[in-house]
Amino acid sequence: MAFFRTVTKLRSRLGQPPSLRDSVRCLQTQASSDLDLHSQLKELIPEQQERLKKLKKEHGKVQLGTITVDMVIGGMRGMTGLLWETSLLDPDEGIRFRGLSIPECQKVLPGATPGGEPLPEGLLWLLLTGKVPSRSKNMHYPVNNGVVPKFQIMCSRPLMLCLLEHIPMTQFTTGVMALQVQSEFQKAYDKGIPKSRYWEPTYEDSLSLIAQLPVVASYVYRRIYKGGRMIPVDDSLDYGGNFSHLLGFDDHKMQELMRLYVTIHSDHEGGNVSAHTGHLVASALSDPFLSFAAALNGLAGPLHGLANQEVLLWIKSVVDECGENITKDQLKDYVWKTLNSGKVVPGFGHGVLRKTDPRYTCQREFALKHLPDDPLFRLVSKLYDVVPPILTELGKVKNPWPNVDAHSGVLLNHFGLTEARYFTVLFGVSRSIGIGSQLIWDRALGLPLERPKSVTMESLESFCKKAAS
Protein backbone atom coordinates (compact mmCIF):
# COMPACT_ATOMS: atom_id res chain seq x y z
CA MET A 1 0.00 0.00 0.00
CA ALA A 2 3.04 2.32 0.09
CA PHE A 3 2.39 3.31 -3.50
CA PHE A 4 -1.09 4.50 -2.75
CA ARG A 5 -0.11 6.25 0.46
CA THR A 6 2.45 8.30 -1.43
CA VAL A 7 -0.10 9.11 -4.09
CA THR A 8 -2.56 10.42 -1.53
CA LYS A 9 0.10 12.77 -0.21
CA LEU A 10 1.25 13.62 -3.76
CA ARG A 11 4.76 13.78 -2.32
CA SER A 12 4.15 17.46 -1.77
CA ARG A 13 5.96 19.68 0.67
CA LEU A 14 4.79 22.84 -1.00
CA GLY A 15 6.00 26.29 -0.12
CA GLN A 16 6.16 28.95 -2.83
CA PRO A 17 2.91 30.54 -4.06
CA PRO A 18 2.22 30.54 -7.80
CA SER A 19 3.60 33.66 -9.47
CA LEU A 20 0.25 34.51 -11.08
CA ARG A 21 -1.73 34.19 -7.86
CA ASP A 22 -2.47 37.89 -7.44
CA SER A 23 -3.69 38.27 -11.02
CA VAL A 24 -6.60 35.88 -10.60
CA ARG A 25 -9.71 36.99 -8.76
CA CYS A 26 -10.58 33.65 -7.25
CA LEU A 27 -7.31 33.07 -5.43
CA GLN A 28 -8.72 34.45 -2.23
CA THR A 29 -8.49 30.80 -1.17
CA GLN A 30 -4.71 31.33 -0.71
CA ALA A 31 -1.90 29.11 -1.81
CA SER A 32 -1.37 25.81 -0.05
CA SER A 33 0.91 25.76 2.95
CA ASP A 34 3.73 23.37 3.74
CA LEU A 35 1.38 20.59 4.80
CA ASP A 36 0.61 17.32 3.10
CA LEU A 37 -2.86 16.83 1.67
CA HIS A 38 -4.22 14.73 4.55
CA SER A 39 -3.02 17.25 7.13
CA GLN A 40 -4.58 20.14 5.23
CA LEU A 41 -7.91 18.36 5.10
CA LYS A 42 -7.69 17.58 8.79
CA GLU A 43 -7.39 21.32 9.44
CA LEU A 44 -10.11 22.32 6.98
CA ILE A 45 -12.80 19.81 7.90
CA PRO A 46 -13.75 21.14 11.37
CA GLU A 47 -14.11 24.64 9.90
CA GLN A 48 -16.40 23.41 7.13
CA GLN A 49 -18.40 21.26 9.53
CA GLU A 50 -19.12 24.33 11.65
CA ARG A 51 -19.95 26.31 8.52
CA LEU A 52 -22.51 23.72 7.44
CA LYS A 53 -23.95 23.48 10.94
CA LYS A 54 -24.39 27.27 11.06
CA LEU A 55 -25.93 27.34 7.58
CA LYS A 56 -28.47 24.71 8.54
CA LYS A 57 -29.30 26.32 11.88
CA GLU A 58 -29.67 29.90 10.62
CA HIS A 59 -31.04 29.35 7.12
CA GLY A 60 -32.43 25.84 7.05
CA LYS A 61 -35.97 26.99 6.24
CA VAL A 62 -35.02 29.42 3.45
CA GLN A 63 -36.69 28.47 0.17
CA LEU A 64 -34.37 28.06 -2.83
CA GLY A 65 -37.07 28.05 -5.49
CA THR A 66 -40.29 26.55 -6.74
CA ILE A 67 -40.68 22.98 -7.95
CA THR A 68 -42.93 22.69 -11.00
CA VAL A 69 -44.59 19.72 -12.63
CA ASP A 70 -42.27 20.25 -15.61
CA MET A 71 -39.28 19.73 -13.33
CA VAL A 72 -40.68 16.53 -11.84
CA ILE A 73 -41.40 14.91 -15.21
CA GLY A 74 -38.47 16.55 -17.02
CA GLY A 75 -35.54 14.89 -15.31
CA MET A 76 -35.41 17.40 -12.42
CA ARG A 77 -33.67 19.92 -14.69
CA GLY A 78 -33.22 23.25 -12.99
CA MET A 79 -34.20 21.82 -9.62
CA THR A 80 -31.71 22.65 -6.86
CA GLY A 81 -31.29 19.60 -4.69
CA LEU A 82 -27.64 18.68 -4.09
CA LEU A 83 -24.72 20.01 -2.07
CA TRP A 84 -21.59 19.74 -4.24
CA GLU A 85 -18.54 21.60 -2.98
CA THR A 86 -15.90 20.94 -5.63
CA SER A 87 -17.35 22.78 -8.62
CA LEU A 88 -20.22 25.00 -9.74
CA LEU A 89 -21.62 25.33 -13.25
CA ASP A 90 -22.69 28.76 -14.45
CA PRO A 91 -24.93 28.79 -17.56
CA ASP A 92 -22.93 31.63 -19.11
CA GLU A 93 -19.39 31.24 -17.74
CA GLY A 94 -19.20 27.46 -17.63
CA ILE A 95 -17.62 25.33 -14.94
CA ARG A 96 -15.66 26.76 -12.04
CA PHE A 97 -13.45 24.47 -9.97
CA ARG A 98 -13.56 25.87 -6.43
CA GLY A 99 -14.25 29.27 -7.96
CA LEU A 100 -11.61 29.08 -10.69
CA SER A 101 -12.60 29.09 -14.35
CA ILE A 102 -10.77 26.84 -16.80
CA PRO A 103 -8.60 29.69 -18.17
CA GLU A 104 -7.70 30.64 -14.60
CA CYS A 105 -6.80 27.03 -13.78
CA GLN A 106 -4.56 26.96 -16.84
CA LYS A 107 -2.76 30.04 -15.53
CA VAL A 108 -2.22 29.09 -11.90
CA LEU A 109 -2.16 25.32 -11.56
CA PRO A 110 1.28 23.72 -11.89
CA GLY A 111 2.22 22.12 -15.20
CA ALA A 112 4.79 19.52 -16.17
CA THR A 113 6.72 22.38 -17.79
CA PRO A 114 6.42 26.16 -17.41
CA GLY A 115 3.39 27.31 -19.38
CA GLY A 116 2.23 23.73 -19.91
CA GLU A 117 -1.22 22.29 -19.37
CA PRO A 118 -2.35 21.84 -15.74
CA LEU A 119 -1.33 18.70 -13.91
CA PRO A 120 -4.38 16.69 -12.79
CA GLU A 121 -2.64 16.35 -9.42
CA GLY A 122 -2.85 20.10 -9.01
CA LEU A 123 -6.55 20.11 -9.78
CA LEU A 124 -7.09 17.28 -7.29
CA TRP A 125 -5.42 19.37 -4.61
CA LEU A 126 -7.57 22.36 -5.56
CA LEU A 127 -10.83 20.37 -5.48
CA LEU A 128 -10.04 18.86 -2.10
CA THR A 129 -8.69 21.93 -0.31
CA GLY A 130 -9.99 24.94 -2.22
CA LYS A 131 -6.37 26.09 -2.44
CA VAL A 132 -3.98 26.36 -5.36
CA PRO A 133 -0.91 24.17 -4.89
CA SER A 134 2.41 25.88 -5.34
CA ARG A 135 4.58 25.00 -8.30
CA SER A 136 7.19 22.50 -7.15
CA LYS A 137 9.47 20.01 -8.80
CA ASN A 138 8.23 17.52 -6.20
CA MET A 139 4.63 17.89 -7.32
CA HIS A 140 4.42 14.89 -9.57
CA TYR A 141 2.70 11.56 -9.80
CA PRO A 142 4.80 9.11 -7.79
CA VAL A 143 4.52 5.74 -9.47
CA ASN A 144 5.95 2.52 -8.21
CA ASN A 145 6.36 -0.74 -10.07
CA GLY A 146 4.52 -2.43 -7.21
CA VAL A 147 1.25 -1.28 -8.71
CA VAL A 148 1.61 -3.63 -11.68
CA PRO A 149 1.81 -6.97 -9.82
CA LYS A 150 -0.92 -5.76 -7.43
CA PHE A 151 -3.07 -4.90 -10.44
CA GLN A 152 -2.36 -8.25 -12.08
CA ILE A 153 -3.57 -10.11 -9.00
CA MET A 154 -6.71 -8.03 -8.42
CA CYS A 155 -7.85 -7.03 -11.89
CA SER A 156 -6.31 -8.97 -14.72
CA ARG A 157 -7.92 -12.28 -13.75
CA PRO A 158 -11.49 -10.91 -13.57
CA LEU A 159 -10.89 -8.98 -16.80
CA MET A 160 -9.72 -12.14 -18.55
CA LEU A 161 -13.25 -13.46 -18.03
CA CYS A 162 -14.56 -10.61 -20.17
CA LEU A 163 -14.88 -11.30 -23.86
CA LEU A 164 -12.84 -9.02 -26.09
CA GLU A 165 -16.17 -8.15 -27.70
CA HIS A 166 -17.39 -6.61 -24.45
CA ILE A 167 -17.43 -2.84 -24.76
CA PRO A 168 -14.46 -1.08 -23.10
CA MET A 169 -16.67 0.44 -20.39
CA THR A 170 -17.91 -3.00 -19.34
CA GLN A 171 -14.34 -4.17 -18.93
CA PHE A 172 -13.28 -0.97 -17.18
CA THR A 173 -16.12 -1.23 -14.67
CA THR A 174 -15.22 -4.88 -14.08
CA GLY A 175 -11.67 -3.80 -13.24
CA VAL A 176 -12.89 -1.15 -10.80
CA MET A 177 -15.15 -3.65 -9.06
CA ALA A 178 -12.21 -6.03 -8.73
CA LEU A 179 -10.27 -3.34 -6.85
CA GLN A 180 -13.02 -3.11 -4.22
CA VAL A 181 -11.47 -5.93 -2.19
CA GLN A 182 -8.85 -3.46 -0.92
CA SER A 183 -11.40 -0.93 0.40
CA GLU A 184 -10.17 0.63 3.63
CA PHE A 185 -13.61 2.11 4.29
CA GLN A 186 -15.31 -1.27 4.25
CA LYS A 187 -12.73 -2.71 6.65
CA ALA A 188 -13.00 0.27 8.99
CA TYR A 189 -16.81 0.24 8.91
CA ASP A 190 -16.88 -3.46 9.75
CA LYS A 191 -14.68 -2.71 12.77
CA GLY A 192 -17.05 0.00 14.00
CA ILE A 193 -15.23 3.21 13.08
CA PRO A 194 -17.11 6.25 14.46
CA LYS A 195 -19.03 8.41 11.99
CA SER A 196 -16.78 11.38 12.71
CA ARG A 197 -13.87 9.50 11.14
CA TYR A 198 -15.64 8.12 8.05
CA TRP A 199 -13.80 10.61 5.89
CA GLU A 200 -10.36 9.13 6.63
CA PRO A 201 -10.78 5.66 5.05
CA THR A 202 -12.89 7.32 2.34
CA TYR A 203 -9.90 9.55 1.64
CA GLU A 204 -7.61 6.51 1.42
CA ASP A 205 -10.00 4.67 -0.90
CA SER A 206 -10.68 7.64 -3.17
CA LEU A 207 -7.03 8.53 -3.67
CA SER A 208 -6.10 4.88 -4.08
CA LEU A 209 -8.80 4.45 -6.71
CA ILE A 210 -7.75 7.57 -8.62
CA ALA A 211 -4.14 6.41 -8.59
CA GLN A 212 -4.88 2.95 -9.95
CA LEU A 213 -7.32 3.88 -12.71
CA PRO A 214 -4.74 4.70 -15.43
CA VAL A 215 -3.32 1.20 -15.03
CA VAL A 216 -6.75 -0.44 -15.18
CA ALA A 217 -7.87 1.71 -18.10
CA SER A 218 -4.67 1.19 -20.07
CA TYR A 219 -4.89 -2.56 -19.55
CA VAL A 220 -8.40 -2.53 -21.02
CA TYR A 221 -7.15 -0.55 -24.01
CA ARG A 222 -4.14 -2.71 -24.70
CA ARG A 223 -6.07 -5.93 -24.10
CA ILE A 224 -8.70 -5.02 -26.69
CA TYR A 225 -6.62 -3.18 -29.27
CA LYS A 226 -2.92 -4.02 -28.77
CA GLY A 227 -2.74 -7.74 -28.08
CA GLY A 228 -2.71 -7.49 -24.29
CA ARG A 229 0.90 -6.43 -23.68
CA MET A 230 1.09 -4.01 -20.75
CA ILE A 231 3.57 -1.17 -20.65
CA PRO A 232 5.50 -0.55 -17.40
CA VAL A 233 4.77 2.64 -15.54
CA ASP A 234 7.33 5.44 -15.80
CA ASP A 235 8.01 6.87 -12.36
CA SER A 236 9.45 10.05 -13.88
CA LEU A 237 6.07 11.04 -15.29
CA ASP A 238 3.04 12.72 -13.76
CA TYR A 239 -0.51 11.34 -13.71
CA GLY A 240 -1.57 12.50 -17.17
CA GLY A 241 1.80 11.80 -18.73
CA ASN A 242 1.87 8.30 -17.31
CA PHE A 243 -1.66 7.58 -18.49
CA SER A 244 -0.63 8.52 -22.02
CA HIS A 245 2.53 6.41 -21.68
CA LEU A 246 0.65 3.37 -20.36
CA LEU A 247 -1.71 3.55 -23.32
CA GLY A 248 1.32 3.52 -25.62
CA PHE A 249 1.60 7.20 -26.57
CA ASP A 250 4.88 8.87 -25.62
CA ASP A 251 4.62 11.95 -27.81
CA HIS A 252 5.10 15.02 -25.63
CA LYS A 253 2.12 16.75 -27.22
CA MET A 254 -0.11 13.74 -26.55
CA GLN A 255 0.98 13.77 -22.92
CA GLU A 256 0.10 17.46 -22.73
CA LEU A 257 -3.28 16.69 -24.28
CA MET A 258 -3.92 13.98 -21.68
CA ARG A 259 -3.13 16.42 -18.87
CA LEU A 260 -5.60 18.90 -20.34
CA TYR A 261 -8.20 16.22 -21.07
CA VAL A 262 -8.16 14.75 -17.56
CA THR A 263 -8.28 18.20 -15.97
CA ILE A 264 -11.23 19.61 -17.91
CA HIS A 265 -13.28 16.39 -17.73
CA SER A 266 -12.70 15.86 -14.01
CA ASP A 267 -15.80 17.52 -12.57
CA HIS A 268 -18.95 19.32 -13.76
CA GLU A 269 -20.88 19.92 -10.54
CA GLY A 270 -23.12 17.25 -9.03
CA GLY A 271 -26.25 17.02 -11.14
CA ASN A 272 -24.93 15.11 -14.15
CA VAL A 273 -25.63 11.38 -14.28
CA SER A 274 -22.20 10.05 -13.29
CA ALA A 275 -21.55 12.55 -10.49
CA HIS A 276 -25.06 12.24 -9.08
CA THR A 277 -24.90 8.44 -9.26
CA GLY A 278 -21.61 8.34 -7.38
CA HIS A 279 -22.99 10.67 -4.71
CA LEU A 280 -26.27 8.77 -4.44
CA VAL A 281 -24.69 5.34 -4.06
CA ALA A 282 -22.10 6.66 -1.60
CA SER A 283 -24.88 8.21 0.49
CA ALA A 284 -25.83 4.63 1.43
CA LEU A 285 -22.24 4.32 2.77
CA SER A 286 -21.13 2.19 -0.14
CA ASP A 287 -17.36 2.55 -0.41
CA PRO A 288 -15.72 4.67 -3.15
CA PHE A 289 -14.97 1.66 -5.34
CA LEU A 290 -18.61 0.54 -5.43
CA SER A 291 -19.86 4.10 -5.77
CA PHE A 292 -17.54 4.93 -8.64
CA ALA A 293 -18.34 1.68 -10.45
CA ALA A 294 -22.00 2.72 -10.33
CA ALA A 295 -21.07 6.15 -11.65
CA LEU A 296 -19.23 4.53 -14.57
CA ASN A 297 -22.34 2.62 -15.57
CA GLY A 298 -24.19 5.93 -15.78
CA LEU A 299 -21.34 7.46 -17.74
CA ALA A 300 -21.60 4.64 -20.28
CA GLY A 301 -25.04 5.80 -21.39
CA PRO A 302 -25.51 7.35 -24.86
CA LEU A 303 -26.92 10.55 -23.35
CA HIS A 304 -23.87 11.10 -21.14
CA GLY A 305 -20.36 9.76 -21.67
CA LEU A 306 -20.85 8.18 -25.09
CA ALA A 307 -21.33 11.56 -26.74
CA ASN A 308 -17.62 12.11 -27.41
CA GLN A 309 -17.31 8.94 -29.46
CA GLU A 310 -20.51 9.72 -31.36
CA VAL A 311 -19.10 13.11 -32.40
CA LEU A 312 -15.97 11.60 -33.94
CA LEU A 313 -17.96 8.90 -35.71
CA TRP A 314 -20.34 11.53 -37.11
CA ILE A 315 -17.45 13.73 -38.27
CA LYS A 316 -15.85 10.76 -40.01
CA SER A 317 -19.17 10.03 -41.70
CA VAL A 318 -19.10 13.58 -43.08
CA VAL A 319 -15.61 12.99 -44.47
CA ASP A 320 -16.56 9.60 -45.91
CA GLU A 321 -19.48 11.11 -47.81
CA CYS A 322 -18.19 14.57 -48.70
CA GLY A 323 -14.40 14.46 -48.35
CA GLU A 324 -11.99 16.40 -46.13
CA ASN A 325 -12.25 19.58 -48.20
CA ILE A 326 -16.00 19.96 -47.79
CA THR A 327 -17.25 23.53 -48.23
CA LYS A 328 -19.44 25.30 -45.70
CA ASP A 329 -22.39 25.13 -48.09
CA GLN A 330 -21.94 21.37 -48.46
CA LEU A 331 -21.62 21.09 -44.71
CA LYS A 332 -24.88 22.99 -44.22
CA ASP A 333 -26.60 20.50 -46.51
CA TYR A 334 -25.17 17.57 -44.55
CA VAL A 335 -26.26 19.07 -41.22
CA TRP A 336 -29.80 19.59 -42.51
CA LYS A 337 -29.77 16.04 -43.85
CA THR A 338 -28.86 14.77 -40.38
CA LEU A 339 -31.56 16.83 -38.67
CA ASN A 340 -34.25 15.99 -41.22
CA SER A 341 -33.59 12.29 -40.68
CA GLY A 342 -34.67 12.70 -37.06
CA LYS A 343 -31.15 12.65 -35.63
CA VAL A 344 -29.21 15.27 -33.71
CA VAL A 345 -25.87 16.81 -34.56
CA PRO A 346 -23.68 15.40 -31.76
CA GLY A 347 -21.49 17.77 -29.79
CA PHE A 348 -23.84 20.76 -29.76
CA GLY A 349 -26.09 21.92 -26.93
CA HIS A 350 -25.95 21.35 -23.19
CA GLY A 351 -28.47 20.80 -20.41
CA VAL A 352 -27.19 23.79 -18.41
CA LEU A 353 -24.78 25.86 -20.50
CA ARG A 354 -26.16 28.64 -22.68
CA LYS A 355 -22.91 29.66 -24.38
CA THR A 356 -19.93 27.90 -25.95
CA ASP A 357 -18.49 25.42 -23.46
CA PRO A 358 -15.16 26.74 -22.09
CA ARG A 359 -13.92 23.16 -22.26
CA TYR A 360 -14.48 23.30 -26.02
CA THR A 361 -12.65 26.62 -26.21
CA CYS A 362 -9.51 25.43 -24.42
CA GLN A 363 -9.35 22.35 -26.65
CA ARG A 364 -9.67 24.58 -29.71
CA GLU A 365 -6.77 26.67 -28.43
CA PHE A 366 -4.75 23.49 -27.95
CA ALA A 367 -5.50 22.46 -31.53
CA LEU A 368 -4.56 25.87 -32.92
CA LYS A 369 -1.23 25.57 -31.12
CA HIS A 370 -0.37 21.95 -31.86
CA LEU A 371 -2.36 20.74 -34.90
CA PRO A 372 -3.67 23.72 -36.87
CA ASP A 373 -3.54 21.89 -40.21
CA ASP A 374 -5.28 18.69 -39.13
CA PRO A 375 -8.13 18.06 -41.61
CA LEU A 376 -10.62 17.00 -38.94
CA PHE A 377 -9.79 20.04 -36.83
CA ARG A 378 -10.50 22.28 -39.82
CA LEU A 379 -13.83 20.50 -40.21
CA VAL A 380 -14.64 21.07 -36.53
CA SER A 381 -13.89 24.76 -37.04
CA LYS A 382 -16.32 24.89 -39.96
CA LEU A 383 -18.98 23.16 -37.87
CA TYR A 384 -18.65 25.92 -35.27
CA ASP A 385 -19.62 28.43 -37.96
CA VAL A 386 -22.32 26.30 -39.59
CA VAL A 387 -24.25 24.43 -36.90
CA PRO A 388 -25.30 27.10 -34.34
CA PRO A 389 -27.20 29.26 -36.90
CA ILE A 390 -29.04 26.18 -38.17
CA LEU A 391 -30.01 25.06 -34.66
CA THR A 392 -31.09 28.61 -33.86
CA GLU A 393 -33.24 28.64 -36.98
CA LEU A 394 -34.97 25.48 -35.79
CA GLY A 395 -36.01 27.33 -32.64
CA LYS A 396 -36.14 24.22 -30.49
CA VAL A 397 -32.68 24.39 -28.93
CA LYS A 398 -31.89 26.56 -25.91
CA ASN A 399 -28.16 26.25 -26.49
CA PRO A 400 -26.94 25.84 -30.09
CA TRP A 401 -23.26 26.14 -29.16
CA PRO A 402 -20.62 23.37 -29.10
CA ASN A 403 -19.87 21.48 -25.91
CA VAL A 404 -16.76 19.64 -24.72
CA ASP A 405 -17.56 16.55 -26.78
CA ALA A 406 -17.48 18.47 -30.06
CA HIS A 407 -13.69 18.65 -29.93
CA SER A 408 -12.09 15.98 -27.75
CA GLY A 409 -12.36 13.05 -30.17
CA VAL A 410 -10.65 14.92 -32.99
CA LEU A 411 -7.67 15.75 -30.76
CA LEU A 412 -7.29 12.15 -29.61
CA ASN A 413 -7.65 10.90 -33.16
CA HIS A 414 -4.86 13.21 -34.35
CA PHE A 415 -2.33 11.63 -31.99
CA GLY A 416 -3.29 8.07 -32.90
CA LEU A 417 -5.92 7.18 -30.33
CA THR A 418 -8.51 6.42 -32.99
CA GLU A 419 -10.64 3.82 -31.21
CA ALA A 420 -13.77 5.88 -30.55
CA ARG A 421 -15.46 3.16 -28.47
CA TYR A 422 -12.70 3.61 -25.89
CA PHE A 423 -13.14 7.35 -25.39
CA THR A 424 -15.65 7.01 -22.56
CA VAL A 425 -13.03 5.14 -20.52
CA LEU A 426 -10.81 8.22 -20.72
CA PHE A 427 -13.77 10.26 -19.52
CA GLY A 428 -14.22 7.83 -16.62
CA VAL A 429 -10.61 8.09 -15.47
CA SER A 430 -10.94 11.87 -15.52
CA ARG A 431 -14.26 11.99 -13.69
CA SER A 432 -12.82 9.96 -10.78
CA ILE A 433 -10.99 13.07 -9.59
CA GLY A 434 -14.16 15.11 -9.14
CA ILE A 435 -16.34 12.30 -7.82
CA GLY A 436 -13.64 11.01 -5.48
CA SER A 437 -12.94 14.48 -4.09
CA GLN A 438 -16.61 15.12 -3.39
CA LEU A 439 -17.10 11.71 -1.75
CA ILE A 440 -14.42 12.62 0.77
CA TRP A 441 -16.30 15.83 1.59
CA ASP A 442 -19.62 13.96 1.70
CA ARG A 443 -18.25 11.86 4.54
CA ALA A 444 -16.40 14.75 6.19
CA LEU A 445 -19.59 16.84 6.32
CA GLY A 446 -21.73 13.90 7.39
CA LEU A 447 -24.15 14.27 4.49
CA PRO A 448 -27.14 11.95 4.91
CA LEU A 449 -28.68 9.19 2.84
CA GLU A 450 -30.29 10.67 -0.26
CA ARG A 451 -34.04 9.99 -0.31
CA PRO A 452 -36.17 12.33 -2.46
CA LYS A 453 -39.95 11.96 -2.63
CA SER A 454 -41.49 10.42 -5.74
CA VAL A 455 -45.05 10.89 -7.00
CA THR A 456 -47.45 9.19 -9.37
CA MET A 457 -49.19 10.86 -12.32
CA GLU A 458 -52.46 10.45 -10.43
CA SER A 459 -51.11 12.30 -7.41
CA LEU A 460 -49.80 15.09 -9.66
CA GLU A 461 -53.18 15.40 -11.37
CA SER A 462 -54.93 15.52 -8.02
CA PHE A 463 -52.54 18.17 -6.69
CA CYS A 464 -52.96 20.32 -9.82
CA LYS A 465 -56.77 20.12 -9.61
CA LYS A 466 -56.69 21.27 -5.99
CA ALA A 467 -54.26 24.07 -6.84
CA ALA A 468 -56.56 25.30 -9.63
CA SER A 469 -59.70 25.31 -7.48
Curated annotation (Swiss-Prot):
Q: Which Pfam families match?
A: Citrate_synt (PF00285)
Gene Ontology process terms (BP): carbohydrate metabolic process; citrate metabolic process; tricarboxylic acid cycle
Q: Which domain of life is it from?
A: Eukaryota
Pathway in which the depicted protein is active: Carbohydrate metabolism; tricarboxylic acid cycle; isocitrate from oxaloacetate: step 1/2
First and last residues of the transit peptide: 1-28
Subcellular compartments:
Mitochondrion matrix
Query: What are the annotated GO cellular component locations?
Result: mitochondrial matrix
User: What is the active site of this protein?
Assistant: H304, H350, D405
GO MF assignments: citrate (Si)-synthase activity
Q: What is its EC number?
A: 2.3.3.16
Q: What else is known?
A: Citrate synthase is found in nearly all cells capable of oxidative metabolism.
> How does the record describe its quaternary structure?
Homodimer.
Q: What is this protein called?
A: Citrate synthase, mitochondrial
Which organism does this sequence originate in? Fragaria ananassa (Strawberry)
| Taxonomic lineage of the native organism | Eukaryota, Viridiplantae, Streptophyta, Embryophyta, Tracheophyta
The encoding gene is MCSI
